[in-house]
């Protein structure tokens, strides 16, 4: 869900900058997150798919803050959970591949045929997470749970 790509560039200009044709569905949002703390002795490199939705639970974990992960769409980037990036059109990226909702296709990173059960489970998870998130916002759920302040 990164939203800081070069808006002013056309796809052609962005492709020229990248050195290859840009994929406007998935690649345009590719970004990097760098967190720094004086308390970390050795660098930690996380090489999994994540999104800006994952920053809050990651910071909550690092600061030792308690939170109910069921009420948050993102995941702690430092957890052992596989990465999951959800796009507003229900397309998504996992550690195994990517699903394009506009074509209803799942492409495995290794080029193999996707397991239909895996794809169905991930698609259901994505649809549920989006529905829960929308319901939380539509019903002002956080105010109900935590009260107005």
Predicted ranges, named:
Residues 1-149:
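Solvent-exposed soluble domains appended to multi-pass membrane proteins
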């Amino acid at each position: 869900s990164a939203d800081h790509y070069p808006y002013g560039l056309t796809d052609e200009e962005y492709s020229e900058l990248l050195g290859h044709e840009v994929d406007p569905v998935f690649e345009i949002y590719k970004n990097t997150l760098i967190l720094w703390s004086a308390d970390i002795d050795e660098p930690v490199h996380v090489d999994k798919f994540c999104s800006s939705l994952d920053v809050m639970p990651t910071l909550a974990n690092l600061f030792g803050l308690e939170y109910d992960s069921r009420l948050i769409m993102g995941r702690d980037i430092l957890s052992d959970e596989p990465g999951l990036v959800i796009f507003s059109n229900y397309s998504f990226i996992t550690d195994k591949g990517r699903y394009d909702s506009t074509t209803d296709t799942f492409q495995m990173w290794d080029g193999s045929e996707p397991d239909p059960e895996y794809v169905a489970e991930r698609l259901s998870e994505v649809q549920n997470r989006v529905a829960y998130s929308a319901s939380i916002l539509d019903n002002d759920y956080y105010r109900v749970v935590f009260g107005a302040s």
